[in-house]
Amino acid sequence: MGRRIAVVLFNLGGPDTGNDVQPFLKNLFRDPAIIRAPLPVRWLVARLISTLRAPVVKQNYAMMDAGGGSPLLRETKKQADALQAELAKKLPGDEVRCFIAMRYWHPFTEEAAAEVQKWGADEVVLLPLYPQFSTTTTGSSLSAWHKAYKGKSRTICCYPFEENFVSAHVDQIMAAWERAGRPGNVNLLLSAHGLPESVVKSGDPYQWQCEALAEMIAGRVPADWEVSVCYQSRVGPMKWIGPPTEEEIARISDQGRNILIAPIAFVSEHIETLVELGEEYRLVAEKHGAASYTRVEALGVHPGFISTLTGEVLAALGMKETIRSCAGGRLCPSGWSGCPQAELKQKAGVRITETAG
């Protein structure tokens, strides 16, 4: 009899209906990985932000769904089904089941952990649908998981440079360019969710991974395109990493150029791709005179992306180590102390001196 292998997909989560928007936002902003303040302050800030932002955010969700909910769970289920089917082919002697663990809405991490425990998994692989590691996303999900599930598990921390993943991005970008009529004078904007500068300065490797991925993509698109990285979805008065996506769109549009904009940190369609990139920033481009504005679709169930996830799970199952990146061992240069492999070695009393690769 083969193994029971549970693959747990981490993602952000999203409200099911308009009535869920405010409690979803409250869950998000009271996470200590997001608002780095003492508990009483964090709860007050979460209540304030969720109350102030809920009306506008509700309108944005209503643009995507008549019930005012997020498509993220639906899209994640499609990815889970595709991954489970591929793993079943690769592991015919084992029983593989994919579970979804959302951080800020149902099915919560705690619910997924209870399901995995009830199923009686022999192996558990934690697979974030965040390609780049950040303490604010994967790090937060891992913390919640280890509080909820006391059994052993293997972690895939990041896979931003995996070959099929990079190729899938390029494929989506070129397909969007074809749909746009193959325009010239192209600026390709590779947009990722922003982070406060203080998070990056504390050792979070997210920005480094995003920008290294962007360099890989830039080397595979037409040489006459101008390619740049930008960061969206800023919240609050803190200083964030940049340049901001909205400002880059305005700057390039003022030159009358054709804009292709691709999400490189979001792998599923949701409010930040469909509304922010698809609608709000389109208006900015039109206002500033862009020749055209084309949004590249998120990877979704692109075969290259599902192949990436499949390969990472298989590799994790074959390793003695409990944490894996797409490089096998540690991916990040030694300066990024927020890397989970660095933290693991620090806990074991190992001095960190190695570099990327």
Swiss-Prot record:
Where does this protein reside within or beyond the cell?
A: Cytoplasm
Q: What is the protein's name according to its record? A: Ferrochelatase
Q: Which family would the database say this protein is a member of?
A: Belongs to the ferrochelatase family.
Catalytically driven reaction(s) = heme b + 2 H(+) = protoporphyrin IX + Fe(2+)
* Chief location category: cytoplasm
| Pfam family membership, one | Ferrochelatase
Does the UniProt entry include the keyword Cytoplasm? yes
Question: Could you tell me one molecular function GO term of this UniProt entry?
Answer: metal ion binding
EC class? lyase
This protein's gene is called: hemH
**Organism in which the protein naturally occurs:** Hyphomonas neptunium (strain ATCC 15444)
What PROSITE patterns does the record tag this protein with?
FERROCHELATASE (PS00534)
